[in-house]
Amino acid sequence: MKFLVDTHAHTIASTHAYSTLHDYLNVAKEKGIKLFAITDHGPDMADAPHFWHFVNMRVLPRIIDGVGVLRGIEANIKNQQGDIDFFGDYLKQLDIVLAGFHEPVFPPSTAENHTQALINCIESGKVDIISHPGNPAYPIDIERVAQAAAKHNVALEINNSSFLTSRKGSEKSCRAIALAVKEAGGLLVMGSDSHVAFSLGDFDKAVEVIEAVQFPIERLLNRSPEALLCFLSARGHDSLDEYADLV
């Protein structure tokens, strides 16, 4: 199966990434990708875009040359309370909100602290997807997190870059997460976590994890633009009508 939806990509607005929105659009058209999200790092990261970057995403057309572009963020989980570095009504202006641990903002701690931070973040209702929860630098109680995510309709990400250039040693935990989410009746999403446009929509390693645990395709958000958009609508994002031509 070819997956035509990517929920995790960084532009040069995050200065450790190397591609523009136009670069991503060109690659999306070449690969046949129908919908992707721009999710630059939240403001608490040292090289993140200014807060205004996210506020002003309203100027972006939602469909460009036949490709849907979701206005998003990869926010930083800041503390054990599960707080993130984006807030209030501004969150409602975004189409998709990812959040995860990043060492400059939340230094690795204990498994219990990591677990409680993720559960609190999930329960806050502010976040749609937990990014790279399989990072071995942040061990968690996988079953508790998977159950909380399923209960609150939050997706957990299998991050393809975790098997390539980042977060080495993620394979075991990602497989355990996929299995736990399957058993909890929850949702998974694959993210390329692209920091350069060439890798947009690349999920080869993530697909291996999904297939290894025989994860139900009907609970994988990448299966179609419609699946992701329905999920986001159910999560309370109410500005998605402009994407109707994609489904």
UniProtKB/Swiss-Prot annotation:
Transmembrane segments: none
PANTHER family in the cross-refs: PHOSPHATASE YCDX-RELATED
Required cofactor(s): Zn(2+)
InterPro entries assigned: Phosphatase_YcdX_put, PHP_dom, PHP_phosphatase, Pol/His_phosphatase_N, Pol/histidinol_Pase-like
Hydrolase recorded as keyword: yes
List of residues binding Zn(2+) 3: 74, 102, 132
Cofactor note: Binds 3 Zn(2+) ions per subunit.
Alphabetical list of Gene3D superfamilies matching this protein: Metal-dependent hydrolases
Name this polypeptide is given: Probable phosphatase swp_1620
Entry GO CC: cytosol
NCBIfam families, sorted: PRK09248.1
GO terms assigned for molecular function: phosphatase activity; zinc ion binding
GO BP annotations listed: bacterial-type flagellum-dependent swarming motility
Biological classification of the source: Bacteria, Pseudomonadati, Pseudomonadota, Gammaproteobacteria, Alteromonadales
Enzymatic class: hydrolase
Family, per entry: Belongs to the PHP family.
Sequence positions that bind Zn(2+) 1: 8, 10, 74, 193
Binding site for Zn(2+) 2: 16, 41, 195
EC number, as in UniProt: 3.1.3.-
Keyword annotations from UniProtKB, A to Z: Hydrolase, Metal-binding, Zinc
